[in-house]
Regions:
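Membrane-interface transmembrane helices that cradle and orient dolichyl/undecaprenyl
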Residues: 183-186, 222-240
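Transmembrane-helix signature of polytopic, membrane-embedded enzymes
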Residues: 21-31, 161, 177-203
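Extracytoplasmic catalytic/substrate-binding loops of multi-pass membrane glycan-assembly enzymes
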Residues: 103-117, 123-147, 157
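Aromatic- and kink-enriched transmembrane "portal" helix at the membrane-lumen/periplasm boundary
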Residues: 44, 192-220, 224, 228
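Membrane-embedded, hydrophobic transmembrane alpha-helices
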Residues: 1-79
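Transmembrane signal-anchor helices characteristic of membrane glycosylation enzymes that use polyprenol
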Residues: 67, 83-108, 200-201
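Loop-to-helix entry region of an early transmembrane alpha helix in multi-pass inner-membrane enzymes
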Residues: 2, 138, 154-172
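Membrane-interface alpha helices of multi-pass inner-membrane proteins
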Residues: 39-44, 239-251
Length: 251
């Protein structure tokens, strides 16, 4: 039930974010995930990590309930139109992400830092400190770790759940890159972008998708920022609210 609630919470935030900004839905999931990560991160800085996770979760559920009531009252159309772009992208995501729920950590850095950090956050509901003997590297920011903590707090603490959360975050920014295409009927451009992103994932031998390293995520976020700027170069009311959470997570 908590996992279902997590999905509904994200859906609630996405609905109102899309309705508020009126942007291409490609940019919305990454913006919501980034904003949730930053909110949980600031909660951790204020020593209220668990409270921040509950606040984001409860706020999303309230947003979903309000969205459902609003849609039923006004018989509004769905916020997302499932076109060929969404169907093909969803199939591609399913292919890549289907292996992750039962996967295990393999890369050394998962055991020396990233996986240990998230496990420690889930155990203590707090950020690690300089006195945490399990953490070898103390200079890495905890932006993506905050997102993994938030998802795993409700969806489970297995390694596969952490890897799935990381994969969903990566593909949310992949999806945002598709928003660079202004003409939604130019399927060939979407196909070329999708093929390029798929090849990046497939041939990235050093940093596979079954690890928590951010080395692959950071350039994808940068590409998503480029896509926003290219799509809305003269519309700061749409560009800035999207770039703010993207770049906050990037930093």
């Amino acid at each position: 039930l908590k996992t279902l609630g997590l999905c509904l919470s994200f859906a609630g935030w996405m609905y109102w974010f899309k309705r508020w900004l009126r942007v291409d839905f490609c940019f919305v999931p990454a913006a919501v995930f980034s904003a949730a990560s930053v909110a949980v991160y600031f909660g951790g800085i204020l020593f209220r990590l668990e409270y921040a996770a509950w606040l984001v979760y409860a706020g999303g559920l309230a947003a979903f309930a309000a969205a459902a009531a609003f849609s039923l009252a006004r018989r509004a159309r769905p916020a997302v139109h499932l076109g060929l772009r969404e169907i093909c992208f969803g199939i591609g995501c399913a292919v890549f992400l289907s292996i992750l729920p039962g996967a295990h950590f393999q890369h050394y850095d998962n055991f020396s830092h990233w996986g240990i950090v998230v496990k420690l956050m889930l155990s203590t509901n707090a950020f690690p400190t300089a006195q945490s003997g399990l953490i070898d590297f103390l200079n890495y920011p905890l932006g993506t770790s905050s997102f993994l903590y938030y998802v795993c707090y409700y969806a489970g603490r297995r390694e596969g759940t952490m890897l799935l959360a990381q994969g969903i975050l990566i593909f949310a920014f992949f999806y945002a890159v598709l928003g660079a295409v202004r003409h939604t009927r130019c399927f060939l451009l979407y196909a070329l972008l999708g093929a390029g992103l798929s090849l990046l994932s497939f041939f990235n031998i050093t940093i596979r998708i079954n690890n928590l390293l951010v080395d692959f995520l950071l350039p994808v976020i940068a590409l998503a920022c480029w896509a926003v700027i290219r799509r809305y170069p003269t519309d700061p009311e749409k560009m800035l609210p999207l770039l703010l959470p993207y770049q906050a997570l990037l930093l």
